[in-house]
């Protein structure tokens, strides 16, 4: 397949912008580390930081079986870092706004560098913990809908369970899925809908951890129905995914 020059230019621009953002974040963390860490080494910081920042991309490179666990680790760490990068960028920009005001007035002291860096990194850690707890704790929200149409069998009320954007993969695994299945089955739904993005992108962890078997434990009187989402298409294994879902009904 011939790669279009426009595509190469676009990817180059995106990588350049991504690298610039990560250098900005890394520079701040390195500055803070140099002030508080005894024996700080630029190489000891920047090499692990680069692996973390590009982990999501590096983890997608095909590897021999012996190295696949390392690739999965990079991808998981890189996925978490994407969240850290987004929050860190906003917080460091805010800290730099204050820093600019100080620089224009009395100058920036090392105490501010240490203090602001500690606050930013502490907030990132706190938000990461809260976000992880929310992501791995299924929340049930109830909505009542009225439809002016009789249901089959004369039943006037149906309980429909809808779970979208589950993103099963290396980060969201079988343990989370079991909790989700238990919560849904406890509702005793008449119908279960999975409207897309059941898997994150790669089908490999879905197959390796036999997550379809856990999904097969979903119970509803009128069945379980799933459709494809954009992340299923990202992985490029649509036939295998459909076949695996059909095996469990």
What are the residue ranges of the model-derived segments?
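Soluble catalytic domains of enzymes that build or remodel membrane lipids, polysaccharides, and related
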Residues: 146-249
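Hydrophobic alpha-helical transmembrane segments in integral membrane proteins
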Residues: 114-115, 124-150, 170-175, 236
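Non-catalytic terminal accessory segments
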Residues: 1-136
